[in-house]
Regions:
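Peripheral, non-AAA+ core regions of ATP-driven protein-machinery
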Residues: 3-203
Length: 203
């Protein structure tokens, strides 16, 4: 629209499990494919992102996009999904004044999106300071008024890993042993033991 697009928040919750991923929030097929691509990229590069590869078989991931009654689709949330997953897996927060848009491939490339002007207007409206966009959209900035661009710090990226240096409030280190999710697995075992004890008691 003339006034701009909208900002989507993405929530990720991790729990002990068997490697399942749940996506909620009335998401369309293309957006679900973005989740699959982002997670596939993370799994194949987990050591680089500071995540123990064994983790993925021991946890379930629930990704939710609020305002569940509103249908959502399209590939432009790809790098946002990727960053949200990395943030949850590494326990490094995302800066609150950063927004991003871009399709992600299985190899971590960031592909161009449509409606750049509308997305920038939405960021301004929500008080966002920094917006990350695909490098391939750089040519589209020529058609966007300078007064819009001057209200934002616009970062152009070619690969998803570049997003992390801009968006995360901390640096990722390779395989942080403290974050190997043993505490989640341990908690899961405690719960199972408790359930077994309760069943034995009932029987």
């Amino acid at each position: 629209t003339q006034v701009g697009g909208d900002i989507l928040n993405i929530e990720v919750n991790l729990s002990s499990g068997k490697g399942m991923i749940h996506a909620t929030g009335k998401l369309g097929d293309v957006m679900k494919e973005s989740i699959t691509a982002a997670l596939g990229y993370i799994k194949s590069n987990s050591v680089e992102f500071g995540v123990n590869p064994k983790v993925f078989d021991k946890i379930d991931i629930h990704l939710h996009v609020p305002e569940g009654a509103i249908p959502k689709d399209g590939p432009s949330a790809g790098i946002t999904i990727f960053t949200s997953l990395i943030s949850s897996l590494t326990e490094i927060k995302i800066k609150r004044d950063v927004a991003m848009t871009g399709e992600i491939t299985l190899k971590g490339r960031v592909l161009p999106i449509g409606g750049l002007k509308e997305k920038l207007l939405a960021a301004i409206r929500y008080g966002i300071k920094t917006v990350i966009i695909p490098k391939d959209n750089e040519k589209d900035l020529i058609e966007i008024q300078k007064d819009i661009q001057n209200k934002l710090t616009i970062k152009k990226v070619e690969f998803a890993r570049e997003v992390l240096d801009i968006a995360l409030d901390g640096k990722i280190s390779k395989i942080n042993k403290k974050l190997d999710w043993r505490h989640i697995v341990s908690e899961s075992m405690k719960q199972k033991n408790q359930q077994n004890q309760e069943k034995s008691f009932v029987n």
